[in-house]
């Protein structure tokens, strides 16, 4: 884990992702419904990284707020996202919005407290959790610290607002990140 710490903490600025030393940019889909944007964004990741998708893991510092409203989606979409939301809570990928995480997000206490982070190596759920963070952002999911990290390719992707994904190179060679963003454009 020490080698990963070198990548994470030197290359990702947790206070301002676009100020990260390896920040390359972000992509988003235009003129689509929110649901379409979310799904298209994940499909782009799956398509581009199809040969290395299993090398990704998820690093989050997200909280849940059960009292918040649900965004306007179809009944089928709400059913899907509620299922993912409950699974994320059960797996500890979303933690209760209180204590240290509340202090961090409410008072902007820095530096970023590493002990509020969660990891998931469950390949079948990591993209669903990213989609959830976009769909329920500013509602039932609190925070925006959600990273898909591929240590082999030395790249970190994060849900960018509710429109796509941002891209941070975890090495001085940004070519893979640039190639990915060009693929998405």
Regions found by a protein language model. Give the residues of each.
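Structured alpha/beta or helical-core interaction and ligand-binding surfaces enriched in interleaved
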Residues: 1-164, 169-185
């Amino acid at each position: 884990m020490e080698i990963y710490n070198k990548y994470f903490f030197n290359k990702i600025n947790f206070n301002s992702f676009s100020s990260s030393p390896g920040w390359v940019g972000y992509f988003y889909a235009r003129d689509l419904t929110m649901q379409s944007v979310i799904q298209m964004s994940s499909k782009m990741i799956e398509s581009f990284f199809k040969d290395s998708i299993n090398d990704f893991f998820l690093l989050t510092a997200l909280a849940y707020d059960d009292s918040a409203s649900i965004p306007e989606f179809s009944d089928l979409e709400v059913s899907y996202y509620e299922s993912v939301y409950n699974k994320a809570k059960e797996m500890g990928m979303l933690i209760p919005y209180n204590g240290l995480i509340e202090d961090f997000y409410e008072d902007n206490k820095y530096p970023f407290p590493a002990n509020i982070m969660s990891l998931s190596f469950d390949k079948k759920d990591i993209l669903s959790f990213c989609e959830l963070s976009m769909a329920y952002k500013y509602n039932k999911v609190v925070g925006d610290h959600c990273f898909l990290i591929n240590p082999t390719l030395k790249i970190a992707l994060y849900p960018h607002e509710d429109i796509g994904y941002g891209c941070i190179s975890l090495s001085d060679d940004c070519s893979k990140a640039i190639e990915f963003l060009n693929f998405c454009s």
